[in-house]
Amino acid sequence: MRASTILFVLGAAILAVIGVTTALDSGEIDKSTQENHRLLRSGSMEQEPDEERKFIKVPSFMNKAAREAKKAKKKAEIANLVWLKLQKYSDSYALNYVDDMVKSGRSADDEIKFLKKHMKVSNNLQRVIEGHFRSHAELGRVLAKPKYK
């Protein structure tokens, strides 16, 4: 190499070093921010290998909305099941009587006792009625407005 080329490269390196130090001193480049970025990059590479990736956590309000929608869908399916079971194992007089019981304000226990006494209601159906339709107003709403699939 020629001496002029070596001097040219050395001069360019000196100017680059002077420019960086001037920029750091004047505050154009924040040294602590630069170091933080470097540490974050190196730390993230060490903590997350390729075979083990972390997933982003869904915000809780999204989970709650999904849970509520799932509960509502299941409740509607169970309401439909109860209605179909009651129609299968009963006559129209018994369903009218249950509607009258609901309108008169009797409790859910009275309705369940009536269903067990006058219709073929299995223990499983009784648990469904007790668990999901405890209030007589809700049971009355299900019986008054059946939904068929």
From Swiss-Prot:
<keyword id="KW-1048">Host nucleus</keyword>
<keyword id="KW-0732">Signal</keyword>
<feature type="signal peptide">
    <location>
        <begin position="1"/>
        <end position="23"/>
    </location>
</feature>
<keyword id="KW-0843">Virulence</keyword>
<feature type="short sequence motif" description="RxLR-dEER">
    <location>
        <begin position="38"/>
        <end position="53"/>
    </location>
</feature>
<dbReference type="GO" id="GO:0005576">
    <property type="term" value="C:extracellular region"/>
</dbReference>
<dbReference type="GO" id="GO:0030430">
    <property type="term" value="C:host cell cytoplasm"/>
</dbReference>
<protein>
    <recommendedName>
        <fullName>Secreted RxLR effector protein 3</fullName>
    </recommendedName>
</protein>
<keyword id="KW-1035">Host cytoplasm</keyword>
<comment type="similarity">
    <text>Belongs to the RxLR effector family.</text>
</comment>
<comment type="function">
    <text>Secreted effector that completely suppresses the host cell death induced by cell death-inducing proteins.</text>
</comment>
<dbReference type="GO" id="GO:0042025">
    <property type="term" value="C:host cell nucleus"/>
</dbReference>
<keyword id="KW-0964">Secreted</keyword>
